[in-house]
Amino acid sequence: MGNTEIVAMILAGGQGSRLGVLTKKLAKPAVPFGGKYRIIDFPLSNCANSGIYTVGVLTQYKPLELNAHIGIGLPWDLDRKDGGVSILPPYQEEKGGNWYKGTANAIYQNIEFVDRYDPEYVLILSGDHIYKMNYTKMLEFHKEKNADATIGVIEVPVNEASRFGIMNTRDDMSIYEFEEKPKIPKSNLASMGIYIFNWKTLKKYLRNDEANKGSSNDFGKDIIPSMLNDGGKMVAYPFEGYWKDVGTIESLWQANMDLLKSDNKLNLHDQDWRIYSTNPVRPAQYIGENAKVTNSLIVEGCTVNGTVQNSVLFQGVQVGKNTIIKDSVIMTNAKIGDNVIIEKAIIGNDAVIRKDCVIGTGDEIEIVAAKEEVKMGSIMKNNKAV
């Protein structure tokens, strides 16, 4: 079928258990973000903007909404006869099917898919990070270094480095050691979970890893250390833009709040590197005569009759009279009644907040699940009814 130079494989099967009720019915990459996107839109858009048009999306946990969102890949120009986007659930063989056992096993189960295109390189991506990145530049770096593997890295604060997989490098960015969440890190170059491998080399390591019954079948824990031990040439590609792992409630809330900063590094208004998504046609937003909106993202289809400060309102959100929303993320089609106070909260899709409620104002980020109804006069603080 091919001789495609590079194939992208997006690992999108994560449950996202640390996101609590937000991922109760959908995979983490399908979680809404930034008013009109889902997390998966970022790696898909990065692929399209980088000219990579053969993409596999490896799904597993609660894939229905994610599959429906991606569809045939039209918003990302991935609806193609040759290549395009393919949804890849765990592989079913004659002896029966298995869940993906780890990130490496997920790619191993799809060797046949990649081989159809006979690529020289394969790009491995996580489906649950928010960032904009030109993968073509990373591929050029990989070629220049004549590497077996190139790993995207980003500098993190030294006091946070022990939370990440850390790459220890020489001056030429060649990697001599990988440490998974070290107690005393030697470096602050954190792995972004973005890898470019020479496909023939990776395929050999995937097969060896699968044959090792003691392996956890993970890129960070098994494949990368194994390649390093064998003397493979591995280099770190430094990335200096905005990047956030939105795997927790706090980081998801913060990433949305980052969009409201005047020096926002993600810049979703950049026409040279657009983030594409599947968006229904909605009427223009309506801001009532007594409404007050400051430093907020208000997406089309919203009706605002109250006060909105430093918040992100997704499509179709309704805000009642005398209601105050502050430092919050209100997801698609949520209905907020009159005389409500919401502060530092994430309100899920289609949630209904009846009038006279108080949600938030405590130390924790308040969460209301998708389609949940909060009854009239309820008070919720630190995720407990008061």
UniProtKB/Swiss-Prot annotation:
Pathway: Glycan biosynthesis; glycogen biosynthesis
Keywords: ATP-binding, Carbohydrate metabolism, Glycogen biosynthesis, Glycogen metabolism, Nucleotide-binding, Nucleotidyltransferase, Transferase
Chemical reaction(s) catalysed: alpha-D-glucose 1-phosphate + ATP + H(+) = ADP-alpha-D-glucose + diphosphate
GO MF term (any one): glucose-1-phosphate adenylyltransferase activity
EC number: 2.7.7.27
Cited PROSITE patterns: ADP_GLC_PYROPHOSPH_1, ADP_GLC_PYROPHOSPH_2, ADP_GLC_PYROPHOSPH_3
One GO BP: glycogen biosynthetic process
Entry annotated with the keyword Transferase: yes
Amino-acid positions noted as binding alpha-D-glucose 1-phosphate in the UniProt annotation, renumbered to this chain: Y100, G165, E180, K181, S191
PANTHER family xref list: GLUCOSE-1-PHOSPHATE ADENYLYLTRANSFERASE, GLUCOSE-1-PHOSPHATE ADENYLYLTRANSFERASE-RELATED
Quaternary data: Homotetramer.
Gene3D superfamilies in the record: Hexapeptide repeat proteins (2.160.10.10), Spore Coat Polysaccharide Biosynthesis Protein SpsA, Chain A (3.90.550.10)
Similarity comment: Belongs to the bacterial/plant glucose-1-phosphate adenylyltransferase family.
Signal peptide: none
Protein name, UniProt field: Glucose-1-phosphate adenylyltransferase
Stated role: Involved in the biosynthesis of ADP-glucose, a building block required for the elongation reactions to produce glycogen. Catalyzes the reaction between ATP and alpha-D-glucose 1-phosphate (G1P) to produce pyrophosphate and ADP-Glc.
